């Protein structure tokens, strides 16, 4: 291979490698999950080490705790061992929460997909949470004699984590900012509650984004964030979408 050819590739790595991971819960318990790993290296012209072999050696250390200092220490070690310019790691996995129905208080498991990512040269870990919520259209409510169209929506909340943040607290921040929450177990009294709760709290997707942004901006442990909300419209062919990034706000 010529020297010119050796400089064409900018990044190399592995993707979709499944590994066991342990997540801490707010109640002090540990939750075992399976994470899909992606790790990429921004390469120089030549490599000193074997990327796949080094990944397999170091990955078990990443699964023990998701904590900024330990992750960045391991990433720097990885970077030096294989002689690359930059390393980026992401782990994606489901996180389960036992959630009570609002009236019957019956419990069911809610699944929240999350991704943790970090790079050498950066100080924090970025946590991305995918949270289902309910939106109810304010316009539909205003023009109708009875009822209003409502639907499930997905909020994607990305937070730069320089100090530890409980996933449950981030999920709660998002869920409390929508027309109503989503539950896995609902009896008839619960369905009545969530229907009326959404009707009394109509929101466009941009309203949800704004409310999350204000609450995130006031949180002492959140330094940077972005939020997107996509509503899977029940009566329209299209979906509704809104997005905001804290870098563009004066909060």
Swiss-Prot record:
The record marks 137 as: May be catalytically important. It holds the Pfam family GCHY-1. Gene3D superfamilies: Urate Oxidase. It catalyses: GTP + H2O = 7,8-dihydroneopterin 3'-triphosphate + formate + H(+). One of its GO terms (biological process) is tetrahydrofolate biosynthetic process. Keywords: Hydrolase. GO terms for molecular function: GTP cyclohydrolase I activity. InterPro entries: GTP_cyclohydrolase_FolE2, GTP_cyclohydrolase_FolE2/MptA. Signal peptide: none annotated. Pathway: Cofactor biosynthesis; 7,8-dihydroneopterin triphosphate biosynthesis; 7,8-dihydroneopterin triphosphate from GTP: step 1/1. Its EC number is 3.5.4.16. NCBIfam families: PRK13674.1-1. Belongs to the GTP cyclohydrolase IV family. Converts GTP to 7,8-dihydroneopterin triphosphate. This is GTP cyclohydrolase FolE2. It comes from Desulfotalea psychrophila (strain LSv54 / DSM 12343). The gene is folE2.
């Amino acid at each position: 291979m010529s020297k010119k050819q050796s400089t064409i590739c900018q990044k190399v790595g592995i993707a979709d490698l499944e590994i066991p991971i342990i997540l801490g819960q707010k109640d002090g318990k540990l939750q075992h999950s399976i994470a899909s790993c992606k790790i990429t290296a921004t390469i120089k012209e030549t490599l000193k080490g074997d990327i796949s072999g080094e990944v397999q050696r170091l990955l078990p250390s990443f699964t023990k705790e998701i904590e900024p200092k330990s992750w960045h220490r391991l990433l720097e070690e990885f970077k030096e061992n294989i002689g690359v310019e930059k390393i980026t790691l992401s782990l994606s996995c489901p996180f389960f929460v036992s959630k009570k129905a609002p009236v019957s208080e019956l419990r069911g498991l809610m699944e929240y997909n999350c991704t943790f990512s970090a790079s050498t040269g950066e100080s924090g870990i970025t946590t991305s949470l995918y949270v289902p919520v309910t939106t109810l259209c304010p316009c539909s409510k205003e023009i109708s004699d009875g009822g209003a169209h409502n639907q499930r929506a997905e909020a994607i909340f990305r937070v730069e984590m320089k100090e530890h943040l409980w996933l449950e607290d981030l999920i709660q921040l998002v869920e409390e900012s929508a027309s109503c929450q989503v539950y896995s177990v609902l009896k008839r009294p619960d369905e009545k509650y969530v229907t009326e709760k959404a009707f009394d709290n109509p929101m466009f997707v941009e309203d949800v984004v704004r409310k999350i942004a204000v609450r995130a901006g006031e949180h002492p442990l959140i330094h940077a964030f972005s939020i997107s909300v996509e509503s899977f419209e029940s009566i329209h062919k299209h979906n509704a979408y809104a997005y905001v990034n804290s870098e563009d706000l004066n909060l």
